[in-house]
A protein has these predicted regions:
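Residues that define the transmembrane beta-barrel architecture of outer-membrane proteins
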Residues: 84-92, 137-142, 149, 188-193, ...
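Transmembrane beta-barrel strands of outer-membrane/channel proteins
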Residues: 66-74, 109-115, 157-159, 208-212, ...
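N-terminal periplasmic/intermembrane-space "pro-region" immediately following the signal or transit peptide
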Residues: 30-103, 205
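Outer-membrane beta-barrel "beta-signal"
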Residues: 430, 435-437, 441-444, 456-470
Length: 470
């Protein structure tokens, strides 16, 4: 009882700190306006700029987007206890973002309200400072940060989505911001709390960031159609050997200690039309591994690793070329050491296609491969993160047909050479009026049971969406 009371106190304290942080930021901008008024009569009267209103600027910089989505499943799933076996799912989301600029200070906020009829999927507001619950949040403060800008550097403090990679369809380096995989074919990028400094020198940017809290990936609930054979993808249960008569498991996350702080360093530059980046990361692994407490007792851990990545992009005539590679070094051999790389290109056709009534065609293709250089060998760990790493030997393609500013069609195809699984999608979007877009696409997934694509093979569906931006 005492422990429970203590945990509640910590929760209230954390949420109190968050809202205090919000209040102080807004109050500081408001007070800045008042101090301007205080010294107004000692300033030169030659210039009398219009007084800035904090609330008017927030409103003028506000953007809203409401999305209503419908998902119709083509087939019934295999029956199991508690399964959410509906064939029609609906959800709605209202996105809101705004910015406030005062001198060298920039305050940014991005959030959304979301709900749907998926069973056991939505719940409350995200936990502070890290959200370790798999539920999608009804209210999600995804980004809330302050940026201070000086002549040759920026300082960022707060919550934001951090993009690392450079590739178009798949980036092995994008492992900083957590992701919501409640719907694996429609994932969401989530913000993470960090302190970041960007130093600018000519065409080169040096970035150093510290991320004090670890937030894991969000996975589908066990009663979801997207949990495959009955357990969440990337969960402990999916990693436990099938030949055990019975077992128990616990899920462990990194403690809030200095040892588990995440840190990254990145250098981005442009040289004669070539964009490059080089990065190093230290912290808990993006993917979990399985450790054994006893022959029938298991736990997952996000073990500490070093990730070292490099990437490039350039253009030549109608072609864009890009590539990146990540090498993971698992400390104490608690996971695999491996190299994951991707190379790809986008071809843009905008002249000859006008003969067939099109404005433009964009064709993108990428190939991703993984090479394990050292297997997991630590005696306490029994399963590596290999099965959680989806892009080990895969080709990804996408083609976009632009008929006009109002109508676009697209198709995509992925094929996994390692597991012989595949994914196809095709659809269109039509701009019905300024700010109003109708979208429709279909998705087909297939592969052997217990493979990345195969676990979703009963989830072919038709997705329609109506988006209104204002």
């Amino acid at each position: 009882m005492i422990l429970r009371l203590f945990s509640y106190q910590r929760l209230f304290l954390a949420k109190g700190l968050f809202f205090s942080f919000l209040f102080l930021f807004i109050a500081s901008f408001a007070l800045a306006d008042e101090f301007d008024d205080l010294f107004s009569d000692v300033e030169t009267k030659e210039a009398s700029p219009e007084k800035k209103s904090l609330w008017r600027d927030l409103l003028n910089n506000s953007n809203f987007k409401f999305t209503l989505r419908s998902m119709t499943q083509y087939e019934n799933p295999s029956p199991r206890k508690g399964l959410d076996d509906k064939s029609q799912f609906v959800d709605g989301r209202l996105n809101y973002d705004t910015k406030l600029k005062r001198g060298m200070n920039l305050l940014s906020l991005a959030m959304w309200f979301e709900y749907g009829n998926q069973k056991d999927t939505y719940k409350g507001i995200g936990d502070f400072p890290e959200d370790r619950d798999d539920h999608r949040r009804i209210v999600e403060f995804n980004e809330f940060n302050w940026v201070g800008s000086w002549d040759n550097f920026d300082l960022t403090i707060g919550k934001k989505v951090f993009k690392m990679g450079i590739s178009t369809l798949y980036s092995p380096s994008d492992r900083i911001s957590p992701k919501d995989f409640n719907d694996p074919l429609n994932p969401k990028e989530l913000g993470t709390w960090l302190s970041q400094i960007d130093v600018f020198k000519g065409d080169t940017t040096f970035t150093f960031a510290v991320i004090p809290f670890f937030t894991p990936l969000k996975r589908p609930p066990t009663n979801s159609r997207w949990s495959g054979t009955g357990e969440s993808s990337n969960s402990i249960e999916s990693l436990i050997p099938n030949n055990l008569p019975s077992s128990t498991s616990v899920e462990e996350f990194p403690d809030r200690t200095l040892e588990n702080i995440q840190a990254l360093l990145r250098v981005k530059t442009t040289v004669k039309g070539w964009d490059f980046f080089l990065a190093a990361f230290h912290g808990p692994n993006f993917f979990p591994v399985l450790a054994a407490n006893s022959p029938i007792n298991f736990r997952t851990e996000q073990v500490r690793v070093g990730n070292y990545s490099i990437g490039f992009s350039t253009t030549y005539k109608k072609f864009e070329f890009h590539g990146e590679a990540l090498y993971q070094l698992a400390y104490a051999s608690k996971d695999d050491n491996y190299l994951n790389y991707v190379f790809g290109s986008t071809l843009t056709m905008d002249k000859r296609v006008k003969r067939i009534g099109l404005e433009q065609i964009d064709l993108t293709a990428e190939f991703s491969k993984e090479k394990i250089t050292a297997k997991q060998t630590h005696s306490d760990f029994v399963v590596s993160s290999e099965e959680s790493r989806a892009a080990r030997d895969i080709i990804l393609t996408r083609i976009i047909f632009k008929y006009s500013e109002n109508l676009r069609m697209a198709a995509g195809f992925n094929f996994d050479f390692d597991e012989r699984g595949h994914f196809e999608t095709a659809g269109f979007e039509y701009k019905m009026a300024p700010g109003l877009i109708f979208k429709m696409h279909t998705e087909f997934i297939n592969g052997k049971k217990d493979t990345h694509y195969g676990q979703f093979r009963e989830n072919d569906r038709l997705v329609t969406a109506l988006e209104y931006s204002f």
